[in-house]
Amino acid sequence: MSKHQALLVTLVPILVASVLGSTVNGAGVTSISIPATAAGDLIIAFGSNRTSTPSPTPAGWASIATGTCNPFGTGSDRSTRMVYQFTDGGAQTLTFDGGSGDASADPYSGCLIFRGASEIGVGAGVSSNSTGPTLTIPTLTINRVPATVVVFSFYGDSITAAPAGWTISNGMAYAEYLNIWAGGNFTLSATAAEIGTVVEIY
């Protein structure tokens, strides 16, 4: 390599696929069918629950953050959990307890798959007892810059609009090359529970 040449280094993960598991069956189970990927890919996923207790962390996965709320009074508890896994590359089914015995076509779970990620940074759950069309994600102190930040909403409330610089994929949002995240508002597909999770990856 001459003194005039430079080595190009990818500093942040690259989004390679997105998957949305969009149903919960009569037993209250929601599952995401994750296709085969490359070994070492990072999968960030969430599972929602119609109780005050977030779904247990599935075997082989690690928990990042949880969020809970009770937006409509007694019996209206909602919760969500964000998890991650550095995969061996094989196809798999990720299953969460949906906390309800009623079948639904609402998206109870979903995931984003990244290639080139090395670590999980800080994560936070967003809890609110209010309802509305806006999910407010608070400030996240980024430990290593630049980073990719991922936001998930709650079941039935896909993200339809995000701050400038964010990309929306199947109702989930992410932003690359961030040096700071001072918080912001995300528009939801319905006026419902304002709940979600956010995480930094690099």
Predicted region positions:
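Primarily extracytoplasmic/secreted proteins
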Residues: 6-202
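Bacterial N-terminal signal peptides that target proteins for export
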Residues: 1-5
